[in-house]
Amino acid sequence: MAEFSPELRKDPISGRWVIISSARAQRPEAPEPRREDETPEARSRCPFCSGREDQTPPEIFTIRNNGELPNSPGWLTRVVPNKFPAFGIFPEINLRRIGMYQMATGYGAHEVAIESPDHDTYLEHQPLNQVARIVDTWWERHVDLERDRKLKYVLIFKNHGKAAGASLTHPHAQIIATTVIPDVLKSKLLNAKDHFVNGEGCIWCRQLDQIYYHENKIYNQDGTILVAIHQRDRVVADNEKFVAYIPFAARMPYEIHIVPKTHQCSFIQTSPEERLELAKMLKVVLMKVYKLLGNPPYNFYIHSAPNLNVMPRMGDYSTIREDFHWHIEILVRTTIWAGFEQGSGIYINPLNPTDAARYLAETEIDSEVVMSDA
């Protein structure tokens, strides 16, 4: 492999800077256990397992076998309020100030989406029809939460492994809806709008266009080609509706984005057919991650447009349906963000994104397993 000099790269969507420093790829890290430690006692008390429905608050949503009673065994996916919520439903939202400081009632929703009754089967190892049920469950809750016009933003996210923040090993995701738009999203929204109003269209659609149809060249001063960059080399997997790739300015070696090929600003705009293709893509990507890296901890989240029921088509959000493009980000925790990253907001990635994409793309998985409903 040719030597790769450290590079500063800027992500055009978030605006953040990343240092790609392949020479640091062998920096020692504390080893992660491949299987989370769990005592038999803790396992026997898991509140998410079938038969322990009385250990959680009453279910909000479920996909279950016909004829089964609510809050009883027989469910396939189950959503319950978080027992220790970050937000709650209150009669009114009380905004107030204390000097220079602002406060507001923590109005919102905090839910747990339990992926299956099976304590030990990760999402990527579930049958395809079960992964499709999981994706449909997220969609149903997202749609329902946006009916509350006080809620401006819905975030669906998953923590896998203790190092990624999971407190329980039973596979699950979480859903939080808030009255504020997070700053991370605001930055993306504003950059997307700037790109759009400058006549360059949707920035995600443009990225996909470059990945599939363009070769970028860097020239020497004498006009000869120094290097030709094929953006498609960062693709991990694709199917009819979605593409998964390592970003140009990835924060971690295995930061993976999954983006719909059709322009949609919100996850709730997806059709049943598109959600099935998303289930296939999630299965493929996470199976590759599992096989290549040995069940590493990871976080993933769906970045969707703010609640379209309440966002006015004016001001900063006047073009949101045209300029924003919903997507999934997966952060595989193979490195640690230490003092420099935390203090500067600049991330050091010890692996060239093209190499990371190649390693994942070349990781073979059984296509029959991906498509199997058994």
List the predicted regions and their residue ranges.
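HIT superfamily nucleotide-processing domains
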Residues: 1-374
